[in-house]
Amino acid sequence: MGSPCHFALFELKPEFQLDLDQLATRYRELARNVHPDRFADAPEREQRLALERSASLNEAYQTLKSPPKRARYLLAMNGNEVPLEVTVHDPEFLLQQMQLREDLEDLQDEADLAGVATFKRQLKVAQDELNQSFAACWNDAAQREHAEKLMRRMQFLDKLSHEVRQLEERLDD
């Protein structure tokens, strides 16, 4: 992992539960201070450093504002990088994934905007439950494997949520 720590950049304790409004406010404050345009008349070295600080800040913000990315980052901070691609040995979740994808495909085939809205609400509830479960166990070494499983589920639901938003946009047109 690169330094500095994403949480330290925002003067936050490394925790899963964050106040996203506070994070966004702090991001805007910090971004104003390191924005490369403020260093347009500075020597080239200072311009480059400002660009690097701005890029680091943006990366940190994107990581911390996304629950799945924040979960992966916290797990990595605790000692082990979690591989991006890994075979999932979670038959129950694999079945759930297949069912959710089939449901979404049916909604697309039927062009059912109301059904998509319901699906989206159910997905949000599932994401919130996963977030709460992860928050309760991520920092416990004895539950490391469970935390990784939850993080992978979070990643899947996040990707599915993105697909739902894309479907909504297509059906709205």
Swiss-Prot record:
Q: Which SUPFAM superfamilies match?
A: Chaperone J-domain, HSC20 (HSCB), C-terminal oligomerisation domain
The record's GO CC annotations read: iron-sulfur cluster transfer complex
Q: Which InterPro entries match?
A: DnaJ_domain, HscB, HscB_C_sf, HscB_oligo_C, J_dom_sf
> Which CDD domains does the protein's record reference?
DnaJ
| Cited Gene3D superfamilies | DnaJ domain, HscB, C-terminal domain
Q: Does the keyword Chaperone apply?
A: yes
Pfam families documented for this protein? DnaJ, HSCB_C
Q: How does it assemble?
A: Interacts with HscA and stimulates its ATPase activity.
Give the similarity note.
Answer: Belongs to the HscB family.
Name recorded for this polypeptide: Co-chaperone protein HscB homolog
- Which gene is transcribed and translated to give this protein? hscB
